[in-house]
Amino acid sequence: LVKRLHDENIYVIGRIAVFQDQRLPLARPDLALYSSSTGQIWKDNKGLMWMDTAAPEVWDYNIAVAKELLARGLDEVNFDYVRFASDGNLNDIKHPFWDEKTLKTHIVRDFFDRIRAEIPDGRVSADLFGLVTINKDGLGIGQHLEYAWPDFDAIAPMVYPSHYFPGFIGFENPADYPYEIVKYSMDVAVKRIVALQASASTTPMTDRFRPWFQDFNLGATYDAVKVKAQIQAYEDALAGHPELDGGWMLWNPSNIYTKDALEEEPIANSQ
């Protein structure tokens, strides 16, 4: 399959759902979050299981999977769900490894550092909550933009307008304002990274943004106009810093995408 995709000039990314995992908890329940009230494996609002973000063996397992994917010829590994759980009865969670004293942002940062240390030459990327672009307190999930940036080839903030809270930058329903939401978020993110790179004393970082955009109906109907608005907002936000532009991606959980929002690129050497 990888060869076929490469033959079609397709860049192949393998995505790993890291700490939200529906198989590893069954094989290694000792590494999973569990319920303090029932003693069973804890599940979020969707009935999904989670691993302890601080468990070293969970880090080892996911990094080993990433190495195998790269060894099999994939161009990049994308790490998703690189965070603490955020939905469900969080007060009922017991962590077998996290001491509940170490900052969540430091736990996740150390995992990111470990990824880069173990995969120094392979291309890796990470998905972050969209609000991480403007927030610096970790959002309760441990994600911090400046902590993630040095360790990945691409950072993918999920700046879905529907996921922003009512009243965000004055919009009662942010989903109705895709350009404004994405532009504001990426403007702030770019400013933060420019400042980070200016203060770096090591070799210049080569990381880039490659955000996820909304192509699904939530909060508003997402047609070609709204999808294009996000793309335009991103291009406008990155216009002054093309070195940070790593492209963009669309997300639809049903894999049904708005073709009219996309433009065909010219085929190389075409007549």
Provide a role label for each language-model segment:
Residues 6, 11-21, 78-85, 99-142, ...:
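Aromatic-lined carbohydrate-recognition surfaces of secreted/lumenal glycan-active proteins
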Residues 56-70, 136-148, 222-239:
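Short, acidic/polar
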Residues 81-102, 165-166, 170:
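Glycine-rich, proline-tolerant flexible connector loops at the mouths of alpha/beta enzymes
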